[in-house]
């Protein structure tokens, strides 16, 4: 039984509050900075209260303000990032579900070896695979295409492992009952395993969506056309431009806030399923 000591309760809440402040304060500063003019930062002070230039700053980044700097409009950048994140997350989940299903429920030679080889890929850093992967993508003519941005990243050993562990917890009686009812392998997968995996799918979707959204190195390598670049690439260009010329920190922070909105919305909309999926995965 856990003792309910007031001092322990106070310390627990204090640590949680400090952690929340450390995490949320930079985000708060970015939001506040996006509402001020560039002159507000020239004095070296950091404003902590909202300014009156929010509409002007966001109209600049969503209008023609970035195009005047030789950068593309923000809407296509957000769309490119969204397409890449959705393609990676959905692709990873589909491939991992099918892989885990085959490893757990199908009998074929070297089944355990196949899973071991999949799991070993976790030990390969991304940098080791960059050059051979880029060579294959270039030879297939997939540079500056959504396929070239997404397909090399849709295999996930982590998701395959998590789905495999979950499928191993499914009672064998369900499989036997499905066979008695005349259900084939696909029907068992579609009507029984998929509904049971809903929470796990939601949890992994959020993780994989954020993974796809924050990709920087790979899209930077396989895209030379601004029409296919993601928002993080342009954000880096804005940072370099601000350091080399007149700093426009308000515009930079406005773009940063815009880049944070989609993943935050995904987490907010699916947080209950996300937490439930993590709990079920731990079981």
Each model region followed by its residue ranges:
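A structural signal for multi-pass alpha-helical bundles of membrane permease subunits
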Residues: 2-4, 8-283
């Amino acid at each position: 039984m856990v003792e309910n000591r007031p001092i322990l309760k106070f310390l627990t809440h204090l640590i949680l509050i400090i952690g929340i402040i450390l995490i949320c304060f930079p985000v708060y500063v970015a939001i506040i900075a996006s509402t001020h003019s560039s002159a507000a930062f020239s004095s070296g002070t950091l404003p902590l209260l909202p300014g009156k230039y929010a509409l002007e700053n966001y109209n600049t980044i969503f209008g023609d303000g970035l195009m005047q700097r030789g950068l593309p409009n923000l809407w296509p950048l957000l769309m490119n990032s969204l397409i890449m994140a959705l393609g990676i997350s959905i692709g990873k989940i589909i491939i991992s579900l099918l892989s885990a299903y085959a490893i757990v429920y199908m009998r074929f030679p070297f089944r355990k070896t196949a899973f071991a080889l999949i799991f070993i890929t976790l030990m390969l850093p991304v940098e080791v695979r960059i050059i051979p992967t880029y060579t294959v993508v270039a030879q297939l003519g997939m540079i500056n295409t959504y396929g070239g941005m997404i397909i090399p990243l849709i295999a996930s050993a982590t998701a395959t492992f998590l789905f495999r562990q979950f499928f191993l917890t499914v009672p064998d009686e369900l499989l036997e009952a499905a066979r008695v009812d005349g259900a084939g392998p696909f029907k068992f997968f579609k009507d029984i395993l998929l509904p049971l995996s809903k929470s796990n799918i939601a949890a992994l979707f959020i993780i994989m969506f954020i993974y796809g959204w924050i990709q920087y190195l790979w899209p930077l390598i396989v895209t030379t056309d601004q029409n296919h670049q993601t928002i993080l690439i342009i954000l880096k260009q804005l940072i370099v431009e601000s350091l080399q010329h007149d700093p426009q920190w308000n515009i930079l922070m406005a773009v940063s806030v815009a880049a944070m909105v989609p993943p935050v919305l995904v987490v907010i909309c699916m947080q209950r399923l996300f937490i439930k999926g993590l709990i079920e995965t731990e079981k």
